[in-house]
């Protein structure tokens, strides 16, 4: 059955969604991820250039090491998210906004020795439940939920840890996509759809650009400082807001996992309004939803940070309200695990608007 929405273009499932999830969780599945976009950046200045534009430390990225980064606007809102791996000559970027990202990067080349190309038409990604790089292939291994160097988390210290999952994307010529998948099936892999990948992603608290990000999203709200933001690197656009929210705390919203009442047959749709039980006032919205083979119906939702973490919520579905309880991903107090005890010299400058030149400051 074909997927819809953000996963349109590949299969939602192949007739046995529960078995497909179990196979994926057990490490013996293969997933068509050819709907994802691919952008390449070549040239001797590629790493230092991307480092200057993005939220991640990329200047010293070693070949074969997987990371991810964001392109932020001057207010620190998320514009693009990319998974990145360098093969020694080319940085490969896997993204859900390939055309927009490639256009933005191309505008920022100036006189630097870099070449940007959207290669989505020629290359495709295959998903596998593996936590190590593919030998002899360009592959990206998901770093989530490990806290990368320079990162931090907004998860509560006594909260439920994200479910562990192994996941990598192997890049192949698009002309070879079918034969590459068939070879894996011949070796014993089970073909799984995006129902399986989404269920395991949601259970892992893993945000996704196509679903959790909107025009006002801050990285802190989604716990994305784990893997996509380096707090101690040099200047980039949006850095002042990143530093300010990290130091002061209290981002406006927070990502949470919802355990939905499973008594109904249908699940709410992404975009469904979330309210407090007994209230009509919106507290947030559902961003991703799936039926997990063990946890049942689950969803990710972005809520107002002030929403009581212990409150029972109601999700306004097409067939009526659905009760939901919260599994906290981002602390309701809005403070990260390593929030500085008091502002230091750098923070003072940032708070006065005198920080990063890319944000219009006078650094």
Positions of predicted regions on the chain:
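Acidic, proline/glycine-enriched N-terminal capping motif
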Residues: 1-68, 77, 355-357
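Short glycine-/aliphatic-rich beta-strand segments at the starts of folded cytosolic domains
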Residues: 29-52, 115-133, 250-262
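Acidic, low-complexity central loop/insert segments
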Residues: 30, 38, 80-207
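Residue-level signal for inorganic ion chemistry
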Residues: 43, 93, 127, 238, ...
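Short, intrinsically disordered, mixed-charge
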Residues: 51-59, 103-111, 183-187, 279-281, ...
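Glycine-centered loop/turn motifs
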Residues: 63-65, 142-150, 205, 210, ...
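Anionic-ligand-binding alpha/beta catalytic cores of soluble enzymes and soluble regulatory domains
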Residues: 171-259
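Glycine-rich, small/acidic residue-mixed loop/short-helix segments
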Residues: 225-229, 239, 243-363
């Amino acid at each position: 059955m074909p997927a819809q929405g953000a996963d349109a273009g590949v299969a939602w499932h192949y007739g046995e969604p529960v078995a497909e999830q179990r196979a994926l969780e057990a490490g013996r599945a293969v997933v068509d991820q050819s709907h994802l976009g691919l952008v390449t950046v070549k040239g001797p200045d590629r790493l230092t250039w991307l480092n200057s534009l993005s939220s991640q430390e990329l200047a010293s990225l070693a070949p074969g090491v997987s990371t991810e980064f964001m392109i932020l606007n001057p207010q620190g809102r998320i514009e693009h998210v990319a998974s990145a791996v360098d093969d020694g000559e080319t940085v490969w970027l896997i993204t859900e906004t390939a055309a927009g990202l490639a256009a933005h990067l191309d505008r920022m080349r100036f006189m630097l020795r870099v070449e940007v190309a959207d290669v989505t038409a020629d290359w495709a990604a295959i998903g596998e439940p593996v936590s190590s790089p593919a030998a002899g292939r360009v592959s990206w291994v998901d770093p989530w939920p490990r806290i990368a160097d320079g990162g931090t988390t907004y998860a509560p210290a006594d909260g439920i840890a994200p479910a562990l999952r192994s996941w990598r994307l192997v890049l192949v010529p698009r002309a070879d996509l079918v034969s590459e998948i068939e070879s894996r099936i011949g070796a014993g892999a089970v073909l799984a759809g995006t129902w399986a990948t989404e269920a395991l992603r949601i259970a892992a608290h893993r945000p996704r650009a196509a679903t959790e990000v909107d025009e006002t999203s801050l990285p802190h709200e989604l716990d994305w400082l784990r893997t996509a933001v380096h707090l101690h690197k040099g200047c980039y656009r949006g850095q002042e807001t990143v530093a300010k929210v990290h130091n002061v705390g209290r981002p406006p919203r927070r990502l949470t996992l919802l355990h939905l009442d499973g008594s109904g047959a249908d699940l709410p749709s992404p975009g469904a309004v979330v309210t407090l039980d007994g209230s009509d006032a919106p507290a947030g919205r559902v961003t991703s939803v799936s039926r997990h083979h063990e946890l049942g119906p689950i969803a990710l939702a972005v809520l107002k940070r002030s929403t009581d973490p212990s409150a029972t919520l109601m999700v306004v579905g097409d067939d009526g309200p659905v009760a939901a309880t919260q599994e906290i991903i981002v602390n309701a107090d809005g403070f990260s695990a390593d929030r500085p005890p008091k502002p230091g010299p750098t923070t003072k400058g940032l708070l006065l608007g005198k920080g990063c030149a890319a944000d219009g400051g006078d650094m």
